[in-house]
Amino acid sequence: MRQALILFLLILTLFAGPAHGQKSGQPEPKFQAAMPGYTYQFPRDDFSHDDFRIEWWYYTGNLESETGRRFGYQMTFFRVGLEGDQPIDNPSKWKVDHIYFAHMTVSDIQNKNFHFFERINRKGIKNAGAESDRFKIWNSDWSLTADGNTQKIIAQENATGIELNLTPIKKRVFHGKNGISVKGSDKGNASHYFSFTRMKTEGSVFIKGENFKVTGTSWM
């Protein structure tokens, strides 16, 4: 777990910088920077944006079974663009232009157990991906999709995981100024950032093969 987190932080360090400020005579950067003036369009902006270097979909929530047993969960899908400013034309299905990370945790409050799982895959051979024309993100058989206003998370590993339907019950919140969350003083060192702060959640939590029907609330 620690090695994977270090790897992810290293990739963020290498590729999260603003895609601007190129020296004269160099090609224009491939990736856009998060700049003021962006006009959000939904549901399009719930989908993937491959012209930005880093993107993630993050969920966390508190759940309770029909018998009152409590659980917590966290689910995150990451996309990191790797081609850089001068992509190489490579027709191979094995080429790596994006790497996809996924983290899932389940907290079993009653038994004081914390379950953590992660995946790292490439896009080229469809082991993972994030669509730009519809709400579909996946990493192997873990997935995040939508049916109308309801989002669905499916993720299991070693018979432990979640299958949840999440429906917003509060309006979308934009962080920072007009959805621009500033990360530093340099121009473009920011992210487009919005959330659903309360989502009705129902479905199943799986603990080593045991299925618990649950309800609760989540934050995206």
Tell where the protein language model's regions lie, with residue ranges.
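Bacterial N-terminal signal peptides
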Residues: 6-15
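Targeting-peptide/extracellular-domain and disordered-appendage signature
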Residues: 21-220
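Positively charged n-region of N-terminal signal peptides that target proteins for export
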Residues: 1-4
